[in-house]
Amino acid sequence: MWRGLSALVTQAAWAPLRLCARCSTSAESLVPSSTIFALSSGQGRCAIAVIRTSGPASGLALRSLTALQEPPPARRACLRLLRHPCSGEPLDRSLVLWFPGPQSFTGEDCVEFHVHGGPAVVSGVLQALGSVPGLRPAEAGEFTRRAFAHGKLSLTEVEGLADLIRAETEAQRRQALRQLDGELSQLCQGWAKTLTKALAYVEAYIDFGEDDNLEEGVLEQADREVRALEVALGSHLRDARRGQRLLSGANVVVTGPPNAGKSSLVNLLSQKPVSIVSPEPGTTRDVLETPVDLAGFPVLLSDTAGLREGVGAVEQEGVRRARHRLEQADIILGVLDASDLASSSSCSFLDTVVTPLLAQSQDSGGQRLLLLLNKSDLLSANAPACDIALPPHLLLSCHTGAGMDSLLQALKTELAAVCGDPSTGPPLLTRVRHQYHLQGCLDALGHYQLATDLALAAEALRQARRQLNHLTGGGGTEEILDLIFQDFCVGK
């Protein structure tokens, strides 16, 4: 091994990658000097309300409201009487916690007041804090923005925190926690180290290519590193749609011939009367949507008009809209009447909808289909077997609820395939921004492979590394940061 190559690789590994926000010039420019305060718990009456401060005057705020000459022990709750700093009027008996920086959420001196949650108490304490010199009300997301500015959170971790606050299903919560714990940031840091190593090899060859002591195969080693990284990035980009579906919800469309029980199924899955149920065919004429938590996954569930021909103009428009919605579906629940499988409408649905979808579903990227035979409670035990060849299906009765457990288990499997399973596998890309920067990194690696000059190849690797840097928050523009932090509430 060439005597200087390992040293060069080590030096490059410690070069200003700026993957962590605390090393980023743009993050440093965000570090504020003022002290902020806000109600961090929910609005309205509650047993306990949490009011927090962050900034250099937090200690002054604590002394002003408690008359303490010295702060209490760090990170230990102490019961204190709060008084207005101007009038001395008692406000509340409160638990106070002192978090000296940099060992705090924001990296600054912080105080938390755990007060009784009545509106008058909360209002009184906020007014008292507003009278302390150097304190001002916080803006939306400002506490988290300060944590980012002080390197406590990377940008992907900030997004994970925002997703955790908005999470409505178990799958969303699991994914948000993984991102908040830094799994995506750590993955990007690993990729960046690979790029740094490859760049060190290329730059070593540029600087010492004619040195007899340079180890043979240096460029080949760089090529191997880049090819392995291209495979990893390509795999994550192919799965990017899953992460976005986990964040926004999978499109599940219920379809079938008239009177098969589609609306009953939608009402059963959503556990509320979304659709009108009637024995009259063609009752549903428009697409009805409702957000649902199915098996822990977010879903946009759509009820559609029964598919048939030769009906009035209004219903025909409903059929057209139903077919259009089918094209947008991630998962299709095809519903047939188990007691009427030989009817022309059932046979037509099998031929024109189910068979093409099954052929398409052989492709892993195609739409997914679950065929359901509803009204199984109407089947007689002594009835002759149906001679129609049916694809794999589930028996179901929306009337009695029979078969619902099997349906929910099958839906869980299909939804995990569409949205990804946040309990296993690598972290998902939940934002378009993630996909954009990873694609930019992959494009730069493509330029590296095509480069005819080593200087251009090295610049392509630097550009790839910059894209990873932007993903985790280094060198991010103010506009992008503003867009991300505006999703937070005041006090977070």
Curated annotation (Swiss-Prot):
Comment on bound cofactor: Forms a homodimer in the presence of potassium.
Catalysed reaction equations from the record: GTP + H2O = GDP + phosphate + H(+)
Record-linked InterPro entries: G_TrmE, GTP-bd, GTP-bd_TrmE_N, GTPase_MnmE, MnmE_dom2, MnmE_helical, P-loop_NTPase, Small_GTP-bd
Tissue: Ubiquitously expressed. Highly expressed in tissues with high metabolic rates including heart, liver and brain. Weakly expressed in skeletal muscle.
GO CC terms in record: mitochondrion; transferase complex
Protein's GO biological process: mitochondrial tRNA wobble uridine modification
Cysteines engaged in disulfide bonds, as pairs: none
Subcellular location field: Mitochondrion
Binding-site list for 5,10-methylenetetrahydrofolate: R52, E112, K152, K492
GO molecular function, one term: tRNA 5-taurinomethyluridine synthase activity
Enzyme Commission no: 3.6.1.-
UniProt: Mg(2+) binding residues: S263, T284
Residues the entry annotates as binding GTP: 256-263, 282-286, 303-306, 374-377
UniProt-annotated binding residues for K(+): N259
Tree of life domain: Eukaryota
Cofactor(s) essential for the protein: K(+)
Keyword Translocase in annotation: no
Residue range of the transit peptide in the UniProt record, numbered on this chain: 1-20
Keyword field: GTP-binding, Hydrolase, Magnesium, Metal-binding, Mitochondrion, Nucleotide-binding, Potassium, Transit peptide, tRNA processing
Subunit structure: Homodimer; forms a dimer in the presence of potassium. Interacts with MTO1; forms the GTPBP3-MTO1 complex composed of homodimers of GTPBP3 and MTO1.
Stated role: GTPase component of the GTPBP3-MTO1 complex that catalyzes the 5-taurinomethyluridine (taum(5)U) modification at the 34th wobble position (U34) of mitochondrial tRNAs (mt-tRNAs), which plays a role in mt-tRNA decoding and mitochondrial translation. Taum(5)U formation on mammalian mt-tRNA requires the presence of both GTPBP3-mediated GTPase activity and MTO1 catalytic activity.
Family recorded in the similarity comment: Belongs to the TRAFAC class TrmE-Era-EngA-EngB-Septin-like GTPase superfamily. TrmE GTPase family.
Protein name: 5-taurinomethyluridine-[tRNA] synthase subunit GTPB3, mitochondrial
Source species of the chain: Mus musculus
Gene behind this protein: Gtpbp3
